[in-house]
Regions:
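Arg/Lys-rich RNA-binding interfaces used to dock onto structured RNA substrates
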Residues: 1-48, 116, 182, 190-193
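RNA substrate-binding interface of SAM-dependent RNA methyltransferases
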Residues: 4, 29-121
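Short, charged, surface-exposed secondary-structure boundary motifs
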Residues: 9-10, 106, 125, 167-171
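Short secondary-structure boundary/capping segments
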Residues: 9-12, 30-34, 86, 126-128, ...
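Structured adenosyl-cofactor binding patch, chiefly the S-adenosyl-L-methionine
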Residues: 17, 61-62, 76-89, 147-193
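Short secondary-structure transition/capping segments
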Residues: 31, 79-81, 126-129, 170
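Active-site/ligand-binding-proximal alpha/beta "capping" segment
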Residues: 115-164
C-alpha cells in the first residue's frame, strides 16, 4: 500500500505505518453471564467515544464480565474509542442490542439486580450490596437514562457530591460503581496499584 493511501485511510495525523485487519468477535448474552459473579455495565446512548473507551478499559480493571449497550451508543469500533480502551476492547465481552428493555427483562429472569445512578436515588451507592449478580445502568452524557430504561432498574442510587455539581461524567460514575462492586466482592490480585 502506498504511503498516500495509508495516510488517507488513517485517522491520525502521523500514522505509525502499521495496519491490521481483525475479525470482530461475536458474543451472546451467555458469554457475559457468570452466575452470582456476573458484573455488567449497561449503557444507553453514550455518545462520546472517549467516555465509552474509558468505561471499557475501567471495566476490565474492575473485573466486569461484560458490557451491554444499545444501538444508539457510539460505535464501539470508533478509532477514538479503540485508542481509549488501551487494548481492553479485545478482552471485554460485549453485546449490542436493538431493544435494550427486552434484554433487561432477560437479565431480570437470570436474577441479575440492576442499579441506576439516578436523581431519584436517595441512598448512597456504597450502602447497597453488590456481592450478587448485578448490572449498572449508565445513560447518555447530556440526558442520563431515558424513563423507559430507568424504570427497568431494581434500585436507584446516588453518588455523593459537594458544591453545585448536579452530576458526574458518565465514565466517572461508571468507574465508581464498578470499583465499589469489586471492593465489596473482595476481588484483589497482585496487579493492584
Amino acid at each position: 500500500m502506498s504511503d498516500a493511501v495509508f495516510r488517507e485511510i488513517s485517522d491520525t495525523q502521523t500514522p505509525q505505518g502499521i495496519l491490521a485487519i481483525v475479525r470482530m468477535p461475536k458474543y451472546d448474552l451467555s458469554d457475559l453471564l457468570q452466575g452470582d459473579h456476573t458484573h455488567l455495565l449497561i449503557l444507553e446512548s453514550v455518545q462520546d467515544p472517549g467516555n465509552l473507551g474509558t468505561m471499557v478499559r475501567t471495566g476490565e480493571g474492575a473485573g466486569i464480565t461484560g458490557i451491554i449497550m444499545n444501538k444508539t451508543t457510539v460505535d464501539l469500533f470508533n478509532p477514538k474509542t479503540i485508542r481509549s480502551t488501551m487494548g481492553s476492547i479485545y478482552r471485554v465481552p460485549y453485546l449490542i442490542t436493538e431493544h435494550l428493555p427486552d434484554l433487561l427483562d432477560e437479565l431480570h429472569k437470570e436474577n441479575i439486580r440492576l442499579y441506576a445512578a439516578h436523581l431519584k436515588g436517595d441512598t448512597y451507592y456504597d450502602a447497597f450490596d453488590f456481592t450478587g449478580a448485578c448490572g449498572f445502568l449508565i445513560g447518555n452524557e447530556g440526558n442520563g437514562l431515558s424513563d423507559e430504561i430507568a424504570e427497568c432498574a431494581d434500585c436507584y442510587l446516588k453518588i455523593p457530591m459537594e458544591g453545585k455539581v448536579e452530576s458526574l461524567n458518565a465514565a466517572v460514575s461508571a468507574a465508581l460503581l464498578m470499583y465499589e462492586c469489586k471492593r465489596q466482592r473482595g476481588e484483589h490480585n497482585e496487579n493492584m496499584v
